[in-house]
Amino acid sequence: MSDTTSATVHAAVREHAPLVQCITNYVSMDLAANVLNAAGASPAMVHDPREAGEFAALAGAVVANIGTPSPRWVDGMADAASTAHDAGKPWVLDPVAVGATSYRLETVDRLLEFEPTVIRGNASEVLTIATRTAGGKGVDSDASLADVREHADELAKRSGAVVAVTGPEDYVTDGMREPLVLPGGDPRMPQITALGCALSALGGACLAVHDDAYEATAAALAMMSAAGERAGAAADGPGSLRWRIIDELAR
């Protein structure tokens, strides 16, 4: 994917300000909302099952993140994902720490029934879904990109989703086109809690304005990586890197 495509997608986000429904975890809400606002999108943290499905009909994209799952939140995710699926709207599955507990894996299995447009996770999370084997240290990955590339390709073919594996290097595959390997940004970015969750939200914004899910996902990863690199040049540590990334996304 060219830099021109990434710039075009980012410009479209700014022009159209897509409404992105984020059913995400307590830890990530603030950062995800600020990243979306900075990029030019409109975040909505609507998760209650009494309205999540109805609201999804209004949104340009839905993002379902299982970081802090509970029965009602999972019901809200399922309702929103079902609405998005039936309406042909894009939605992103972020399977946070899916290998940590059987409840998380069961939740992901339930959500996969609604055919996510994109699955974005770290190497361990993607490996768990692809191979049905537990792995990872909670939200952290103990697998490498080399461990997961073939499994990510197979998962993309099997699920019909674009699969994005993020880490020191990012990997994007739809199981058909040549996979993309992109730089992961500043090496301190993993020290910022919930930045990956915010990246999934940014992916939702890009999907809402660009029909090619493979290109939209790659554009989101490129935007975050570039913002991280620019922010890292002036950041003293993860705290300043966090707010500088938001500033860079707003430029």
Question: How would you describe each model-predicted region?
Answer:
Residues 180-193:
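Short pre-catalytic strand/loop immediately N-terminal to key active-site residues, enriched for Gly-Thr
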Residues 151-156, 213-228, 246:
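Short, well-structured alpha-helical segments that form the helix of a local strand-helix-strand
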Residues 128, 191-222:
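Short, small-residue alpha-helix embedded
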